[in-house]
Amino acid sequence: MKEVLLESREDKQQVYLPEKCIGCGTCVQICPKGELVIGSVGAVARRLIDKDFIEKRKSGACVFCALCARACPTGALEVRKAGTAEKDDSYLSVALQTTIVNEMCVHCGLCVEVCPQGCIEIKDRRLGEDGSLKMSGRTLIDLNACVHCGWCAAVCPSGAISFQKPFAGEFSRDDNVCQACRTCVHTCPANALFNKEWGPGEIVEKVSHRKDACIYCGACAQACPVRAISVRKIAIIPEMKGKKAFEKKLSDPAPWPTLTSLLKTDEDACLGCGNCVIACPVNAFSDPYLAAGHLNELDDKPLLEVLNGTMKVVNQEVCGSCATCAMICPAEAVWLERREVK
């Protein structure tokens, strides 16, 4: 598994495991020194920028308190002493009940189909040889990838799977602000957000929420380029040391993500079609007329514009780092690159 050494001091190391990170920003929310930075969550989740969710400032203010590692629901941060990670019941990822498959499992494979992380597999599955109408095999869960969403337990026909969620919380989304860019849908680690199918003339909400699947991590709110989503953690579910103090700190609204990307364009490749200008959720939020596709009737656009047949970046600083422009461009003429964290 990939490891990123964020900082080393004397015999202590702060290590980031990006493959376990879900981009929720809980570590950023709880850091008392503001040393950790999260940004470009949508672009990272969509694999449209070469960077990780989390970075660290180089101010030297970190006191190695390990609050970030203790609050992380997936164990993506570690504080090591002499090379050994600290792990006890003051760490949420340790206190969290392991997702377990018991002997009642019939190896049907439904859990494999619905797991949003693809972390379940069935090995050696075959018809039973004891004369019964049963399947034999081994159902295995990659605990490094499990996000404790509960999909597997919900669909299991024999009640063979037990799990525990990290947080209880509240989710809200402003339909008037949401631009249906689907960044949140692509980012959610638990497949708790989706777009309903609709028929001709039918009106449905832009994004729907599966309450029972949500782990209230807040990754969707971190990814939303127009800040239409709010997630509040109201309780930590597992029993862990220092639980009340963590709950108090995490009940505060999470800080907005830092802009850690730059929009880059290739003027020679650009077709001037304007797809990026219309699809950009920041542009669309500025004027519904623009969102409806009226590209040329509006003179002022906040982020992207087509001038003289070529796409131009109007203001880098208002970008939501969702990479919707890069997704829709037919000529790969716009992309995101990492911006250095100050």
What is each of the regions a protein language model found here?
Residues T26-V44, L67-A85, L110-L127, W151-P166, ...:
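Iron-sulfur cluster-binding cysteine motifs and their immediate structural context
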Residues M240-K241:
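Post-cleavage N-terminal segment of exported redox proteins
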